């Protein structure tokens, strides 16, 4: 079965304001943040695009989120308000201590093992989990304006171009590392030569 994977926080939900309010400062509260999803603003552009791809391809929608699955009631209320009817909603179990990318990767792995194929994903922070598997991603980039309001820009990322860019970046890092090592060795040789010269004198 073809699937479209959709993240919630910062992707389908334009809720960076809730993150600022509930996850920072002295009164930070994960519980209040997870419950507040029912009042989060729907990113209409993302919701419309998900429905459009689903209509064009016949793919089913799956929600894969790193948020606490203890608050499924609030999460499902939000998803319904966004106008999506996902085949599955995967939220991280409350006692799962793994980080979101690792957990999402395990969900993707199990979906693929069951014979599914993810044809597109919508993500804000964990997009590399999909790109590493060659899955096209719409990255929902959060942008804060000069008065502190959050805006979201959707950017399509081609996995082949992304992989090429990652290889190029890795090659540059390796070249820089080699040059640094060559410089260190040259410096050590020069110091050794100076020591020999001073001993000989």
Model-inferred region functions:
Residues 1-8, 16, 165, 171-201:
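Non-catalytic pre-domain segments flanking phosphatase-related domains
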Residues 108, 116-160:
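Acidic, Mg2+-coordinating phosphoryl-transfer loop and its flanking beta/alpha structural elements
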Residues 51-55, 112, 131:
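Surface-exposed amphipathic alpha-helices with a cationic face
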Residues 2-98:
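Alpha-helical substrate-recognition element adjacent to the catalytic core
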Residues 1-3, 57-60, 115-119, 135:
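Short coil/turn segments at beta-strand junctions that form active-site/ligand-binding loops
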Residues 74-75, 100-102, 149-155:
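Short secondary-structure transition/capping segments
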Residues 99-112:
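Donor nucleotide-activated moiety binding/catalytic core segment of transferases
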Residues 34, 146, 151-176:
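Intrinsically disordered, low-complexity terminal extensions
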């Amino acid at each position: 079965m073809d699937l479209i994977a959709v993240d919630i926080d910062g992707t389908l939900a334009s809720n960076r304001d809730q993150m600022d309010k509930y996850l920072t400062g002295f009164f930070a509260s994960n519980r209040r943040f997870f419950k507040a999803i029912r009042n989060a603003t729907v990113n209409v552009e993302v919701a419309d695009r998900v429905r459009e791809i689903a209509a064009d391809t016949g793919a089913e929608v799956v929600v894969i989120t790193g948020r606490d699955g203890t608050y499924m009631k609030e999460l499902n209320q939000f998803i319904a308000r966004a106008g999506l009817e996902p085949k599955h909603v995967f939220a991280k179990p409350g006692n799962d201590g793994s980080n979101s990318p690792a957990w999402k990767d395990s969900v993707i792995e199990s979906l693929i093992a069951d014979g599914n194929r993810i044809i597109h994903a919508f993500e804000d922070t964990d997009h590399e989990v999909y790109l590493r598997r060659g899955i096209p991603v719409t990255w929902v980039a959060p942008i804060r304006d000069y008065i502190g309001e959050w805006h979201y820009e959707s950017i399509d990322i081609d996995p082949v171009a992304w992989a090429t860019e990652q290889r190029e970046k890795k090659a540059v890092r390796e070249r820089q590392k080699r040059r640094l090592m060559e410089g260190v060795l040259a410096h050590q040789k020069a110091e050794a030569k100076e020591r020999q010269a001073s001993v000989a004198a």
